[in-house]
Amino acid sequence: MSGLRVYSTSVTGSREIKSQQSEVTRILDGKRIQYQLVDISQDNALRDEMRTLAGNPKATPPQIVNGDHYCGDYELFVEAVEQNTLQEFLKLA
């Protein structure tokens, strides 16, 4: 797969995960950065793919990947936004 992908889930009881997913997509949309939203709740293989790319068997959404390169999770994303290094974080620069 190529391009920027945000792994998310449409089925979660966690308000924190919902809020984090929403913030990531809101920021990307606001900066007009194109990405594909990958819903891991539709297929266990997608969840496994996300965890393999993240290098963490317990990783939870949102996770951000560009091509086959893992960018990071929500905390790293927010840190990049705050430090104005989002392009580098997303491996777009």
Curated annotation (Swiss-Prot):
Tissues/organs with expression: Expressed in heart, liver, lung, kidney, spleen, thymus, ovarian follicles, skeletal muscle, brain, lymph node and mammary epithelial and stromal cells (at protein level).
CDD domains with a match to the protein in the record: GRX_SH3BGR
Glutaredoxin domain segment(s): 2-93
CC per GO annotation: cytoplasm; cytosol; nucleus; ruffle membrane
Keyword tags: Acetylation, Cell membrane, Cell projection, Cytoplasm, Glycoprotein, Membrane, Nucleus
Positions where N-acetylserine occurs in the chain: 2
Subunit structure: Interacts with MYO1C (via its IQ motifs); the interaction is dependent on calcium and takes place at membrane ruffles.
Listed name of the protein: SH3 domain-binding glutamic acid-rich-like protein 3
